[in-house]
């Protein structure tokens, strides 16, 4: 057998997988996945049977209910979705190497006969609001719109939910929260505003930053009320105080937040359609939104009538061709992003008349693991890890802003550096155990041994850590002016993760106002069109601070949902 269908048909009939009429159930393949589970068990049950494997692919870090067909195809060779981000060697039966041959929005515009046939037909569905993208912004918008009385469809072009949000690890920035007060952390929306503007080199839109900072506490409260654990509060680069909220023990915030959002969307019976791509925002003769043309992977083109459309499609950091055109210095860089982050939403918005801004500002995350392609959260540094070069020397304030940290790493021998930490840092942040499990964090019982393993000058490394520990004891980093010195590195084993910058966040995007309404080049609102999250520009300026992305997507997602629902009621 060359594929799963050929294998299954040796012992079973077609209707073991398919509906009796042979038609695919929907673009989410709901029926087909139910049949998979009926034979093989749930993802959790399968993960238990494969736990002996070095990389247990079924023990997924993805939120939501990951469908079997996210990786396993039937009538063609399968592709391991993990390989879209990582470079692990999975040996899956009937599989081929990961590839993404997805036509662009412009290329799809050439499907004129199919598109015109769909548009000439009656709408497939009629709702109040369509949300495009199932990341943190999309789910927040869908839930918020639903709670405001709107009927909502949420579409997602990938086979898995979560967008980039599911990969976020550091925290959710918010000011003057109950969690901060409980830890006696003094903060304010004004200070968060100042930090965000400074981090963005004051290119940010102050009005949008004010929305972000002044509503950040409400966003944390909103998530907490829905079941999120955001009790741990850490520090991220560019912040004056600890304001990065995350789960107890320092677990990754993104997957947790998306899981909470997903669970709440399910409770509200929100219509979620996977493998479904937003193609064109439809407008009437007056330029007002009347719906959206979509393309299902299996069902093809159809249109949905809606009063409002919310674009929450993320950025374009995975599209290196587009990145390099805007910033040639990033040509050939790998990305920390999920495979869908190629800029579809920007094309859809532009075709609808939306203006783009700040497109030239593209951020590299300083710590992408050289082995495995795993983004290592900034919280590792925030909790005490140091950065050293191959010569075993520190060379930068570890929790400076990402642009400065990335530039400093690229200036080192080999254009990479090493995160060095001990068991005390590991115990403070449960996310680190994931890196160890993935094999990207070698360990040794001495710094000399660790240096030998990783090609670092062990003698110099030992001296560097001793020097750093003395600075921790003194309470002041006179070498690089690191503002926080949470702990000495002298407990148990030592760890090293080789890291290099990877394209991480695209600060530019669709121009929006303080109601999340998309605007044209004349700064006029396009009635019924909204944007939230990384698809938009103006919030972060020239550089995004760690922890501000989750805050951004939740805050503006909520806002877009509320405003779209209000707009729908009026129309």
UniProtKB/Swiss-Prot annotation:
It is found in: Periplasm. Fumarate binds at residues 377-378, 402, 504, 544, 547. GO terms for cellular component: outer membrane-bounded periplasmic space. Its main location: periplasm. Its cofactor is FAD; heme c. Changing residue 402 to K/Y: Reduces activity 10000-fold. Residues 118-571 are annotated as: Flavoprotein-like. It comes from the Bacteria. Keywords: Electron transport, FAD, Flavoprotein, Heme, Iron, Metal-binding, Oxidoreductase, Periplasm, Transport. Monomer. This is Fumarate reductase (cytochrome). It comes from Shewanella frigidimarina. The gene is fccA.
